[in-house]
UniProtKB/Swiss-Prot annotation:
Enzyme Commission code: 2.7.11.25
SUPFAM superfamilies assigned to the protein according to its UniProt record, in alphabetical order: Protein kinase-like (PK-like)
Domain called Protein kinase: residue spans: 36-291
Organism: Bos taurus
Phosphothreonine found at: 184, 187
List of residues that carry Phosphoserine: 192, 367, 389, 412, 428
Alphabetical list of SMART domains matching this protein: S_TKc
Top-level class of the enzyme under EC nomenclature: transferase
Localization in the cell: Cytoplasm; Cell membrane
Record's protein name: Mitogen-activated protein kinase kinase kinase 7
Topology term for the membrane: Peripheral membrane protein
Post-translational modifications: Association with TAB1/MAP3K7IP1 promotes autophosphorylation at Ser-192 and subsequent activation. Association with TAB2/MAP3K7IP2, itself associated with free unanchored Lys-63 polyubiquitin chain, promotes autophosphorylation and subsequent activation of MAP3K7. Dephosphorylation at Ser-192 by PPM1B/PP2CB and at Thr-187 by PP2A and PPP6C leads to inactivation. 'Lys-48'-linked polyubiquitination at Lys-72 is induced by TNFalpha, and leads to proteasomal degradation. Undergoes 'Lys-48'-linked polyubiquitination catalyzed by ITCH. 'Lys-63'-linked polyubiquitination at Lys-158 by TRIM8 does not lead to proteasomal degradation but contributes to autophosphorylation and activation. Deubiquitinated by CYLD, a protease that selectively cleaves 'Lys-63'-linked ubiquitin chains. Deubiquitinated by USP19; leading to negative regulation of TNF-alpha- and IL-1beta-triggered NF-kappa-B activation.
Gene name for this UniProt entry: MAP3K7
InterPro entries: Kinase-like_dom_sf (IPR011009), MAP3K7 (IPR049637), Prot_kinase_dom (IPR000719), Protein_kinase_ATP_BS (IPR017441), Ser-Thr/Tyr_kinase_cat_dom (IPR001245), Ser/Thr_kinase_AS (IPR008271)
């Protein structure tokens, strides 16, 4: 095995200039590309094409850059992967210098994104799998955040960058092309809008807490098996604008309170209010006691159809209700209960039993830390007025019930409860807004629940950023993004700045167009209603005119009859007088 430096060749020396610490030597095994037998292309990563290949009689994944513009991401990933060694982070075997590529661990299970939203048939997974994936992800990220001498933040946590191995039971984090040292001043914003923390696209001042925000979105996604903000659609800046204004994914009906509390804390607008990854690992480790079976391989429909289970991964036999929230301190909140199909998480076999308050066994008591640095084990029992520090009796469910022979019974998340709770207000039940439940009947709709704005007490972040999104243009389509300039050329920098301003103006115009189109639809709807009202008014006017004509005709007839009556009476009086 030979050890090479990233500055040992012409290609790597130019890349080495991009590394923040030139004195840092990247130690990795230099692999001869002739030893690699490429089999097929399996996708794209943070940079370049990802191929499945054979190397020394084992399956590997190779990432090869396609252009010089991807060299920086290549060096970033090479540098970061050469520093890490964790069971939940993809392993780097080595690198080739000609052509430039990484040789990495191959994940036969594909990405978590494909498991959740890929092509049919989709695999069946349990709540235990979902919780285990999130726990493993948090363990890997916590490792990155605790690295010395410089911690790492991933910046692009999302299901496409989470790979599965061992039958879908083991999760590994990949794609470090956007990762950076935590002490680095970040001037470029990369990542995906649906999972991106608001401070990432609002400016360059952000910390490891941006990974916590992304993790909270992933937790929601694996529980609901729905794409976050999928109902917003359109360009990425629409999602970013919604998140900037406080929109979050809808809460989940009957989600156990400790999970809901953890998830909503991760979504906090203020990064300092989010838990650390270390705290998340502690909480998730305790919660995993109530979700047995995470070590069982994923099953595809063809694997369990013979056992009397559903043959379709899109079966609507189980549901998870999502409740959309729009929390405000100034007014009560209306919450709409929207049924949402969940193809993977089955109903519990029976109602989950409420834990007894006096139960003191290890499996019966769980307290969640109300503060970021508190220890889960040392927390006192909770009071009725608290939600942030809750034992399992408040979940109103015994996740791990036992059968008659004492063996734990397989359980999964049933209908999950929900309360409209702001992450800034979850410490007290008294702060929960009023709830208006709308129950729907009939077949459930496949349309995702709408996300609603989430307005915390403090609408500004800790960095004091205003309502502008100066770096948001980085999520435009690739062909519209400003090309990286040559730092040594004033003309190149001037063109880059001009392009940035034009891209920013383009985004503003696109936003205005979207808002105007929305307003147009509202006006069209109002016009239709006005036309209907006008038609009704016209009909009423005609009826009124007709009634007036009838009234006039009747009045005339009445006068005629009255005159005839007077004539008849006068004639009768004359006859009586003559007689």
């Amino acid at each position: 095995m030979s050890t090479a430096s990233a500055a040992s060749s012409s290609s790597s020396s130019s890349a080495g200039e991009m590394i923040e610490a030139p004195s840092q030597v990247l130690n990795f095994e230099e692999i001869d590309y002739k030893e690699i037998e490429v089999e097929e292309v399996v996708g794209r990563g943070a940079f370049g094409v990802v191929c499945k290949a054979k190397w020394r009689a084992k399956d590997v994944a190779i990432k090869q850059i396609e252009s010089e513009s991807e060299r920086k991401a290549f060096i970033v990933e090479l540098r970061q992967l050469s520093r890490v060694n964790h069971p939940n982070i993809v392993k780097l075997y080595g690198a080739c210098l000609n052509p430039v590529c990484l040789v990495m661990e191959y994940a036969e299970g594909g990405s978590l994104y494909n498991v959740l939203h890929g092509a049919e048939p989709l695999p069946y997974y349990t709540a235990a799998h979902a919780m285990s994936w999130c726990l493993q992800c948090s363990q890997g990220v916590a490792y990155l955040h605790s690295m010395q001498p410089k911690a790492l933040i991933h910046r692009d946590l999302k299901p496409p960058n989470l790979l599965l191995v061992a039958g879908g039971t083991v999760l590994k984090i990949c794609d470090f092309g956007t990762a950076c040292d935590i002490q680095t001043h970040m001037t470029n914003n990369k990542g995906s809008a649906a999972w991106m923390a608001p401070e990432v696209f609002e400016g360059s001042n952000y910390s490891e807490k941006c990974d916590v925000f992304s993790w909270g979105i992933i937790l929601w996604e694996v529980i609901t098996r729905r794409k976050p903000f999928d109902e917003i659609g359109g360009p990425a800046f629409r999602i970013m604008w919604a998140v900037h204004n406080g929109t979050r994914p809808p809460l989940i009906k009957n989600l156990p309170k400790p999970i809901e509390s953890l998830m909503t804390r991760c979504w906090s607008k203020d990064p300092s209010q989010r838990p650390s990854m270390e705290e998340i690992v502690k909480i998730m480790t305790h919660l995993m006691r109530y979700f047995p079976g995470a070590d069982e391989p994923l099953q595809y429909p063809c694997q369990y159809s013979d056992e009397g289970q559903s043959n379709s991964a899109t079966s609507t036999g189980s549901f998870m209700d999502i409740t959309s929230t729009n929390t405000s301190n100034k007014s009560d909140t209306n919450m709409e209960q929207v049924p949402a199909t969940n193809d993977t998480i089955k109903r519990l076999e029976s109602k989950l039993l409420k834990n007894q308050a006096k139960q003191q066994s290890e499996s019966g008591r769980l307290s969640l830390g109300a503060s970021r640095g508190s220890s889960v084990e040392s927390l006192p029992p909770t009071s009725e007025g608290k939600r942030m520090s809750a034992d399992m009796s408040e979940i109103e469910a015994r996740i791990a019930a036992t059968t008659g022979n004492g063996q734990p019974r397989r359980r999964s998340i049933q209908d999950l409860t929900v309360t409209g709770t702001d992450p800034g207000q979850v410490s007290s039940r008294s702060s929960s807004p009023s709830v208006r439940m709308i129950t729907t009947s009939g077949p459930t709709s496949e349309k995702p629940a709408r996300s609603h704005p989430w307005t915390p007490d403090d609408s500004t972040d800790t960095n004091g950023s205003d309502n502008s999104i100066p770096m948001a243009y980085l999520t435009l389509d690739h062909q519209l993004q400003p090309l990286a300039p040559c730092p040594n050329s004033k003309e190149s920098m001037a063109v880059f700045e001009q392009h940035c301003k034009m891209a920013q103006e383009y985004m503003k115009v696109q936003t205005e167009i979207a808002l105007l189109l929305q307003r147009k639809q509202e006006l069209v709807a109002e016009l239709d209603q006005d036309e209907k009202d006008q038609q009704n008014t016209s009909r009423l006017v005609q009826e009124h005119k007709k009634l007036l004509d009838e009234n006039k005709s009747l009045s005339t007839y009445y006068q005629q009859c009255k005159k005839q009556l007077e004539v008849i009476r006068s004639q009768q009086q004359k006859r009586q007088g003559t007689s």
